[in-house]
C-alpha cells in the first residue's frame, strides 16, 4: 500500500475520531462526565480542565457529582461550569458540586438532532476533502511519471473505498447519536 493510501486512511480516521469527540459533548438528557469536557477552571491563575481538579461521578441517570480534590476550588469550578453555558445549573454545598441534568423537551431534542446532522455533514465534508487531496496528489505523481496509469486507477479506487467506508462510519455514529437523543 502506498504512503498516500496510508496517509488518507489516517486523515479520514482523524475526522471520524473528531466527530466522535464532538458527539460525546452533546448531552442526550442523561448525565455524562463528557458534558464537562472543555470546561477549564481558573486554578491559581492557570486554566485547568475540571477532570484534573476533581473526581466526577454519575450516581443517577440525571445527576452528575463533582468532588474537588481541593475544597477551596469549589467556587472556581462552579463559576467555570456556569460560564461554559452548558444549559445546567450547578449547586454546591461547599464540598461537592451537584449538576442536575434537565430532561429534554421534544423541541430541544429536535434542535439537538439538527445540530448532530450539521456536525455529521461537516465530518463528511472533511472526509471528502481528504479524498480530493489524495486524488490530486496521485494525479500529480502520475503526471510526474512516479506511478503508472494503472497504479493511479487502482489507488484512486482504494481512496474511494476508504471514503465510502469512512462515510458509512460517520452515518452509523450519527444514527446512534440521533437514536440516543430521541429515546426518552
From Swiss-Prot:
Its main location: cytoplasm. GO terms for biological process: translational termination. Pfam families: RRF. The keyword ATP-binding does not apply. GO terms for cellular component: cytoplasm. The keyword Phosphoprotein does not apply. It is found in: Cytoplasm. Residues 133-153 are annotated as: Disordered. Keywords: Cytoplasm, Protein biosynthesis. GO terms for molecular function: ribosomal large subunit binding. SUPFAM superfamilies: Ribosome recycling factor, RRF. InterPro entries: Ribosome_recyc_fac (IPR002661), Ribosome_recyc_fac_dom (IPR023584), RRF_sf (IPR036191). Belongs to the RRF family. NCBIfam families: frr (TIGR00496). Responsible for the release of ribosomes from messenger RNA at the termination of protein biosynthesis. May increase the efficiency of translation by recycling ribosomes from one round of translation to another. This is Ribosome-recycling factor. The gene is frr.
